[in-house]
Amino acid sequence: MSIKIELFGITFENPLILASGVVDMTPELLRRAHKEGAGGVVTKSIGIEPRKGYDNPTVVEVPCGLINAMGLPNPGWKAFLEEFEKESFDFPVIVSIFGGNPEEFAFLAEKLERVGDAFELNLSCPHAKGYGLEIGQDPENVYRVVKAVKDVTDKPVIAKLTPNTSDITKLGLAAEKAEADGVSAINTLKAIAIDIYAKRPILSNKFGGYSGPGIKPIALRAVYDLASKLDIPIIGIGGITTWQDAVEFLLAGASAVQIGTAVYLKGFSVFREIAEGIRKYLEEEGFSSVKEIIGLAQKV
């Protein structure tokens, strides 16, 4: 049975997408993710200027996941474009971009128009001052950023939403009003880990983003809420490590899912395992496509 999906007019071999920020953004590693079963990939977030990121330690493993504060390390748009515009991929590549204001997002979308199949707007990084979270918590800012990007590109635009808010649906509705093609949710939760013997925060940045199985129920609720209010597709993110997790997100209303921390902890093979589990589930439950189960839990 095929578990292909159509999203934003793009064909994905399956509904599993490599999340941004998990692996280095070399073309070779993105191809490896696809070879191991990812239906598509999202690059690391690209900004206007190169960023070194934070000093180590930048990642700490905690019960039920990870806390990371990488600091949005990236080579800048010029170096990224130089490396990627000469590459061709036989699978969907979504380019993640970040900026400090709508003009910066629009600038990057214009400059990177020749690369990838869609843009994901990182409106929700919880640990990089002046970017992401500080922009993405305000529905008006979400609207302005999405609209600025939509004004300069014909490619699909996906707004990545923060869970660090009282009502994520307001952010989703703002993105939809600005004609976003879809939203992805959730990004990481702002968190901290403390070394009880050193008596100080473990990460060099003190705070980071919490990801992994521990945030799955929160992410699932966010997707469920968004699906009840929005008419545009939702990509579910947050703690997906098994095929059962992925199916839950699809039933909640996600059209596809992104997988990140599970790749860090278990390797790329997690994509094939989850894809096979989804395929068997559909067969056993009498469905002929992924599309048939999207949002079924909304109809109770």
From Swiss-Prot:
Principal place of residence: cytoplasm
Residues reported in the UniProt entry to bind FMN: 20, 44-45, 122, 160, 186, 212, 238-239, 260-261
Co-factor(s): FMN
Keywords: Cytoplasm, Flavoprotein, FMN, NAD, Oxidoreductase, Pyrimidine biosynthesis
Cofactor note: Binds 1 FMN per subunit.
HAMAP family, per database record: DHO_dh_type1 (MF_00224)
Listed transmembrane segments: none
Identification of the protein by name: Dihydroorotate dehydrogenase B (NAD(+)), catalytic subunit
Binding positions (substrate): 44, 68-72, 122, 187-188
GO molecular function, one term: dihydroorotate dehydrogenase (NAD+) activity
Family statement: Belongs to the dihydroorotate dehydrogenase family. Type 1 subfamily.
Example GO biological process: 'de novo' pyrimidine nucleobase biosynthetic process
Pathway where it operates: Pyrimidine metabolism; UMP biosynthesis via de novo pathway; orotate from (S)-dihydroorotate (NAD(+) route): step 1/1
Catalytic activities: (S)-dihydroorotate + NAD(+) = orotate + NADH + H(+)
Subunit text: Heterotetramer of 2 PyrK and 2 PyrD type B subunits.
Function summary: Catalyzes the conversion of dihydroorotate to orotate with NAD(+) as electron acceptor.
Active-site positions on this chain: 125 (nucleophile)
Enzyme class (EC, first level): oxidoreductase
GO CC terms of this entry: cytoplasm
Enzyme nomenclature, EC number: 1.3.1.14
Subcellular location: Cytoplasm
